[in-house]
């Protein structure tokens, strides 16, 4: 009985943890990225669609883009956690 309780409690904790992660779209909105970028047209910065097209098929793109956002090279330094940056970059690269 105790084993079953532990398994159920662990599964519940894992499921609850997933709900706390912000989606990439939420991060982009919360961090002000939409002030300079839009999904499908150039604003101050390139559109997410153009960024996704540029890096399509580039397996190193997610890490490189997260690095650029963290360091602020050619782009203002992002005030976000690594998890938030990965979610945002993942979302941008998925835009079609």
Feature map (PLM): residue ranges:
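Positively charged n-region of N-terminal signal peptides that target proteins for export
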Residues: 1-4
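Processing junctions and N-termini across compartments
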Residues: 15, 27-30, 74
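Axial heme c-ligation environment in periplasmic c-type cytochrome domains
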Residues: 35, 44-56, 62-96
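Hydrophobic helical h-region of N-terminal Sec-dependent signal peptides
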Residues: 6-14
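Sec/Tat signal peptide C-region and signal peptidase I cleavage site
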Residues: 14-21
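Short functional micro-motifs and their immediate structural scaffolds
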Residues: 41
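Sequence/structural segment immediately N-terminal to covalent heme-attachment motifs in c-type
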Residues: 22-37
């Amino acid at each position: 009985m105790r084993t079953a309780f532990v398994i159920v409690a662990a599964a519940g904790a894992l499921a609850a943890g997933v709900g706390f992660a912000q989606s990439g779209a939420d991060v982009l909105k919360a961090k002000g990225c939409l002030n300079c970028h839009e999904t499908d047209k150039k604003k101050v910065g390139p559109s997410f669609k153009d960024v996704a097209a540029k890096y399509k098929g580039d397996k190193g793109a997610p890490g490189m883009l997260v690095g650029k956002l963290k360091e602020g090279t050619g782009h203002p330094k992002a005030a976000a956690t690594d998890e938030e940056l990965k979610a945002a970059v993942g979302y941008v690269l998925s835009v079609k």
